[in-house]
């Protein structure tokens, strides 16, 4: 758990630059420890909900995707829009693979 002392330099930088914290996090790639620190900063005392997928779950998802189509131009079955919409988008997909905003991070706060 990140201590308040570890977050103080970041908070001081925000104050010195006179940036609104919401503007400081708009459209950022956040991965690994940077993602966790951003969640601590955004959620504060509320804490956050994060359950990373196990390696087995990730491998099963990759196998399932390969069986559906095997990638672009492979000629296999392509997933329907409904199947894509039903896939769970986690915080890693939202903030590390893609970019996310402060408001998307707040969705993971308790």
Curated annotation (Swiss-Prot):
Annotated keywords: Carbohydrate metabolism, Cleavage on pair of basic residues, Disulfide bond, Glucose metabolism, Hormone, Secreted, Signal
Q: What GO cellular component entries does it have?
A: extracellular space
SMART domains to which the protein is assigned, alphabetical: IlGF
Q: Which residues form the propeptide?
A: 57-87
MF terms per GO, please?
Answer: hormone activity; insulin receptor binding
Predominant location of this chain? secreted
Query: What does UniProt give as the signal peptide span?
Result: 1-24
Summarize the protein's role.
Insulin decreases blood glucose concentration. It increases cell permeability to monosaccharides, amino acids and fatty acids. It accelerates glycolysis, the pentose phosphate cycle, and glycogen synthesis in liver.
Q: What is this protein called?
A: Insulin
| Natural source organism | Oryctolagus cuniculus
Q: What is the lineage of its organism?
A: Eukaryota, Metazoa, Chordata, Craniata, Vertebrata
